[in-house]
Amino acid sequence: MKNKKFIKLPLTPAEKALLRKHKIKLADLHTFTTDELEFLLKATSGRAREIRALAEFQTVPSIGIRFAEDLVFLGYYALKELKNKDGAKLTEEYERRKAYWIDPCVEDQFRLVVYFANTGDASKSWWAFTPERKKYRQENGYPADRPQKAWYETIGKGHKAPDDLLTLKDERS
């Protein structure tokens, strides 16, 4: 698997210093075991597990730190745990746990990580799954218990509303 050059991780200054001391690149962290990271970073096993998971999830094309954090939020710590999962069901679980519905492109990301976990095929990005998601939702809709509040209505989440995104695009033009 080809490593991404840019992996973002929420590391402390001490953890960054230890990685520099051992000449370890962020893009290589997913190749270490949790036990090795625990030792190298002088971290708890839980912290090492989370760092490793965030690094591994970012090896998937077009997946960044925020979505990697979403996967950890759902309790996943390795790509192998996502094998044979259903991207639509993961989306529905995520929305229930967050108590708001999310941007539809996030479902495309769930579909991508499941696909990647099953195949290892790095040739696709999340937007390759948009037609599949649209077809599925047209045929199946969303669950009756889907949260009513949208992600952009949540306070302090750093999300932009669809209208704000259009405004930003217009300002850049």
Task: Map each language-model feature to its residues.
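C-terminal extensions
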Residues: 1-173
